[in-house]
Amino acid sequence: MSAQKSGLHPRNRHQHRYDLAALCQTTPELTSFLIRTPAGEQSVDFANPQAVKALNKALLAHFYAVTHWDIPPGFLCPPVPGRADYIHHLADLLGETTGSIPAQATILDVGVGANCIYPLIGVHEYGWRFTGSEVSDAAMSSAQAIIQANTGLSRAIRLRRQKDPAAIFTGIIHKNEFYDATLCNPPFHDSAAAARAGSERKRRNLGQNKDDALNFGGQQQELWCEGGEVAFIKKMIAESQSFRRQVLWFTTLVSRGENLPPLYRALTEAGAVKVVKKEMAQGQKQSRFIAWTFMDDDQRRRFITRKR
């Protein structure tokens, strides 16, 4: 009998423990990374970065029809179930205006990353179309390689280079473009030292040797920015005002609950009409995203009607 993972969205495909036999059949290379736990159960060697990457490759192939997926060394290797949760909760948010989840939604992924994870899940689950922005040439090349290697994705996902590292929406959202939502997994540390300390804690918890590459890796732009998560999201809030009539919902993950009060104050000052917090949980890990709009109920309905 499979044990259920607590807290995942009801539509999340990862409600139960991984069916390792099925995943290994999909991605045979995963077989070499299986271990026995002290309790005698078969598991993946999560302390091995290559094992985590092989697991992601298997999950994306088995559940989301992504037959070719890879990322360069040192980039974030995201936990798929948690990323899927963001997509499903975002779908619920978009469905609240009309009573049904939109089948033709257009989404902007701020910082799509080398892994391209949110568009891959969103296209398969809901048929959405994505624009992914990225400041890193290496990350953008990796994401583009994934898109080109999988049939049909180039029609659903486009990438745009953010030429100004200090900008978020400016230069990415073009005139006369409209998005149902933006999403973002922001950098959460405020310095390289803090990012290294966080990575070291993760390494110790996983029992890795110092020479091991980190499971979830991460480049500078993925892990930290000046002022940390709060400063980054405040910048996003300020910039969102300029695109208040082009985007229905702006959203972003917030890693720590204590970061919410200053963000709520910034949203009030920016004139957000409605602010929503969506709580998520993956096992013992708690997470959340906030969403804000500058449109009232009638304006949101008209936006959707015109866009469709």
Curated annotation (Swiss-Prot):
Domain of life, per lineage: Bacteria
Originating organism: Salmonella schwarzengrund (strain CVM19633)
EC number: 2.1.1.181
Record field: catalytic activity: adenosine(1618) in 23S rRNA + S-adenosyl-L-methionine = N(6)-methyladenosine(1618) in 23S rRNA + S-adenosyl-L-homocysteine + H(+)
Keywords for the protein's UniProt record, in alphabetical order: Cytoplasm, Methyltransferase, rRNA processing, S-adenosyl-L-methionine, Transferase
Biological processes annotated in GO: rRNA base methylation
Name of the protein this chain belongs to: Ribosomal RNA large subunit methyltransferase F
Role summary: Specifically methylates the adenine in position 1618 of 23S rRNA.
The family this protein is said to belong to: Belongs to the methyltransferase superfamily. METTL16/RlmF family.
Record-linked NCBIfam families: PRK11727.1
Top enzyme class: transferase
GO molecular function: 23S rRNA (adenine(1618)-N(6))-methyltransferase activity
Entry-linked Pfam families: Methyltransf_10
Record-linked PANTHER family: RNA N6-ADENOSINE-METHYLTRANSFERASE METTL16, SAM-DEPENDENT METHYLTRANSFERASE
Major site of localization recorded for this protein: cytoplasm
One Gene Ontology term, aspect cellular component: cytoplasm
